[in-house]
Each structure stands twice: as C-alpha cells, then as structure tokens.
Amino acid sequence: MGKRKANHIVPGMNAASAQGQGTGYNEEFANEPLTAAQRQNNKKRKKNQ
C-alpha cells in the first residue's frame, strides 16, 4: 500500500462540499506545531520507525 492519504484533499484549496467534516481535511491540515512527544508519535506505521 503506497500513499494512504486521500488524493482529492488538497491543502491550500478551499474546503469544497466533497471535503466535508470527517474526511480528515480538518484534522490532517491543522496548522498547529507539534510538541516533541507528538512529533515522535507522528508516524502512521510504527513498524517502519
């Protein structure tokens, strides 16, 4: 499995009707900087760390 993020969700574009609540648009591109502990846990697959 290559890239898991949905391809139709483009950061910087406006949130269209297809990108409603729950598509991961708001969670994925929230621009808050991560703390060090969160950055450590940021990888989706622990197996590859």
Curated annotation (Swiss-Prot):
Keywords: Sporulation. Residues 1-49 are annotated as: Disordered. It is found in: Spore core. Coiled coil: none annotated. Its main location: other. One of its GO terms (cellular component) is endospore-forming forespore. It comes from the Bacteria. Induction: Expressed only in the forespore compartment of sporulating cells. One of its GO terms (biological process) is sporulation resulting in formation of a cellular spore. The keyword NADP does not apply. InterPro entries: SASP_SspO. NCBIfam families: spore_sspO. Belongs to the SspO family. This is Small, acid-soluble spore protein O. It comes from Bacillus cytotoxicus (strain DSM 22905 / CIP 110041 / 391-98 / NVH 391-98).
